[in-house]
Amino acid sequence: MKVSELNLKAKSLLEFHLDDIELSGEISKITIHGSGHWYFDLKDEKSSIACVMFKGFNQFVQTQPKVGDMLDLRGYVSLYEASGRYQFIAKSMQKTSLGDLEAKFLALKEKLEKEGLFDINAKKSIVKFPKKIGIITSFTSAALQDMLKLISQKEYNLCKITIFNALTQGQSAPNSLINALKKANEYDLDAIILARGGGSREDLFCFNDEELARCIFSLKTPVVSAIGHEIDYVISDFVADLRAPTPSAAIDMIFPNKLSLEQGLDELTMRFKSQMLNHLKFYQNKIDHLQNLAKAKSLENAFFLRKQKLDFLQSQLKSVLNLKLLNYENKLNNFEELLAQHKNFFDKSKNLINLQKDGKNISLEKLKKGDIIKLCSINESKEAQIL
């Protein structure tokens, strides 16, 4: 018997024997397909099942369901032949009440908000040019690799990155995250990024832990919560000092790039020139005024006294200007050193190679034998084949 024959037979048996089923549970994951079909996972306290509600049926549902909704479904069990995965085909849907996860989330959110853990006045600020940043996430996560890649593209090599490994899913995750936060707080960091890529409501629920929230609030180091995707909200987002919609967005929000450094230098230079011109104009007007007063005096003694005062003011002007020039010269030297440090990083980055397959970036571990790839540097690109 072929695999396709077995799957077809199993599908027929399931649809024949389980053709009219009432099913209740909570949505933990849902995808609204462009075709209009709804694909979602329904779960209870022990298990979950993949479900589908085709457009022909869901058009009669008044409200589109979302993660956390409790549903009563009616339909039948079938099997997707291509993968051999069995699923529940919903023909009718009735929303009942908030799911357990959503109810717990809202209750904890209300409790902590009343205690002031979300108070905007309690938020700690993050420096514009950080020197030391901690990242708490799983060492093996794709989110970490994306963040490190984006940091390298920022061309900002003045910041030391310290990574703290932690579980980001499951019952043991809150304690693991708390331990990592406490450890990171002992370092002299400018900020801590708490990061985790996208996942289902259940996958991200460890970031809705009360003890974790209180730990974040108690830290002396500012915390950035970068959990899931932009539509995902967890308790750590509300209690943290800054919320980033994604891990990659956290890097964009915290790390300056070469352009911002150059803009900062240009702004400082323009401010310096403007202040110098204003000082010169002010003292020149004062000198002109004193000279006019001196000319108006006919008595030699009065003229002599005014001339003495003018000499004194000129001496003061010279001292003030010298002090200002020295101050701004020191600032310009500091920025020149900063740009010189960046130049070494830019020169090294020219030798970096980017792997592409079918016009898209690809990581080395995803390549397989026979793949045709393109090796791209800043100045040129070459095609190659994996042997």
Swiss-Prot record:
<comment type="similarity">
    <text>Belongs to the XseA family.</text>
</comment>
<dbReference type="InterPro" id="IPR003753">
    <property type="entry name" value="Exonuc_VII_L"/>
</dbReference>
<dbReference type="GO" id="GO:0009318">
    <property type="term" value="C:exodeoxyribonuclease VII complex"/>
</dbReference>
<dbReference type="InterPro" id="IPR025824">
    <property type="entry name" value="OB-fold_nuc-bd_dom"/>
</dbReference>
<dbReference type="GO" id="GO:0005737">
    <property type="term" value="C:cytoplasm"/>
</dbReference>
<dbReference type="GO" id="GO:0008855">
    <property type="term" value="F:exodeoxyribonuclease VII activity"/>
</dbReference>
<dbReference type="GO" id="GO:0003676">
    <property type="term" value="F:nucleic acid binding"/>
</dbReference>
<keyword id="KW-0269">Exonuclease</keyword>
<protein>
    <recommendedName>
        <fullName>Exodeoxyribonuclease 7 large subunit</fullName>
        <ecNumber>3.1.11.6</ecNumber>
    </recommendedName>
</protein>
<dbReference type="InterPro" id="IPR020579">
    <property type="entry name" value="Exonuc_VII_lsu_C"/>
</dbReference>
<dbReference type="GO" id="GO:0006308">
    <property type="term" value="P:DNA catabolic process"/>
</dbReference>
<comment type="subunit">
    <text>Heterooligomer composed of large and small subunits.</text>
</comment>
<comment type="function">
    <text>Bidirectionally degrades single-stranded DNA into large acid-insoluble oligonucleotides, which are then degraded further into small acid-soluble oligonucleotides.</text>
</comment>
<keyword id="KW-0378">Hydrolase</keyword>
<dbReference type="Pfam" id="PF02601">
    <property type="entry name" value="Exonuc_VII_L"/>
</dbReference>
<dbReference type="Pfam" id="PF13742">
    <property type="entry name" value="tRNA_anti_2"/>
</dbReference>
<keyword id="KW-0963">Cytoplasm</keyword>
<keyword id="KW-0540">Nuclease</keyword>
